[in-house]
Curated annotation (Swiss-Prot):
This is 4-hydroxy-3-methylbut-2-en-1-yl diphosphate synthase (flavodoxin). The gene is ispG. It comes from Burkholderia pseudomallei (strain 668). Pathway: Isoprenoid biosynthesis; isopentenyl diphosphate biosynthesis via DXP pathway; isopentenyl diphosphate from 1-deoxy-D-xylulose 5-phosphate: step 5/6. The lineage of its organism: Bacteria, Pseudomonadati, Pseudomonadota, Betaproteobacteria, Burkholderiales. PANTHER family: 4-HYDROXY-3-METHYLBUT-2-EN-1-YL DIPHOSPHATE SYNTHASE (PTHR30454), 4-HYDROXY-3-METHYLBUT-2-EN-1-YL DIPHOSPHATE SYNTHASE (FERREDOXIN), CHLOROPLASTIC (PTHR30454:SF0). NCBIfam families: ispG_gcpE (TIGR00612), PRK00366.1 (NF001540).
Amino acid sequence: MFGGHAPRRVSHAVDVRWGGTLVTIGGAAPVRVQSMTNTDTADAIGTAIQVKELANAGSELVRITVNTPEAAAAVPAIREQLDRMGVTVPLVGDFHYNGHLLLRDYPDCAQALSKYRINPGNVGQGAKRDSQFAQMIEAAIKYDKPVRIGVNWGSLDQDLLARMMDENGARAEPWEAQSVMYEALIQSAIGSAERAVELGLGRDKIVLSCKVSGVQDLVAVYRELSRRCGFALHLGLTEAGMGSKGIVASTAAIGLLLQEGIGDTIRISLTPEPGAPRTGEVVVGQEILQTMGLRSFAPMVVACPGCGRTTSTLFQELALRIQTYLREQMPVWRSEYPGVEKMNVAVMGCIVNGPGESKHANIGISLPGSGENPAAPVFVDGEKVKTLRGEHIAEEFQQIVSDYVARTYGRATAQN
């Protein structure tokens, strides 16, 4: 009678490895969250530090730019630094224009990467395109690495686009230019993938993407792409933008496609504000998947929006404090307290919905609204266990949450 998201589209499973870490994209694997650094890759230490930050935030793959000989030479050192820090997240090399040369001239780089990203629109021009694309695929075969063949609206193969525009002009009923562009993106991606298969790369070594910047454009392209191939698909807008605009655009496009069962890995291409951590894109990606019920990454905090009954800012401050605390604890809790990522915490601002929402959560607190008794009942697994008062409500509630996690999700508890 009632339905949620559509069944997941069937795709080839692509294994991405480093050491003992295996991240599978597609097949029956969960939708993966990945990210990209914005450091100068030639700065091996700075890049390794940012990769570690992204991995600690929960990024399952991290892409790094490999654009110069200096960057390619630094990749093995980045990998070595990460391994020394105990960070085994697979690295994806992002190649444009000269990837065939860098993979040939820097074999240690080719080996240290776990996956290559190839852009068929700029791998070469004219007659050189096919041979240079082939060189990159041959490197992937030689080093047993999967690839993402990533087509971008802004760097589409111009020869292909010109040919398709000419063919469209000869039609009795020409398509709109936008539709020709969509078709060019799809043909470039699928045609390049099929060429890679002809060269000897397995279908289980190929991920496809067709990135654009518009929400409706992305949805239209991926609906058709998913219908016409069985390759694993990487979702993301090319440039989502800054702040709320970028978050909303990414959520609208990616959320809609995931709801239709389309997509095997996602990357949120947010423009970070000056000084803001790069990890924001990882958190947004995780929250899209968790909010949609597709995966669980960290405990969720439910909080009311506030109204005239909640003139105090205490519930807002407490909700932010608890949400930040939970996120900060996850790098440790993820291994120490398996299952904690599914926990729900409610921080409510008044008596109207406070007790009810708190009872539905694993742990909840209903703070007093304007004119209400200055007391905050706490609920654990649906039962009222305590009433907090005074100036230390935040500290006491945080301790209750911490104690609940240790008691409920500790390994000894999980084994009993």
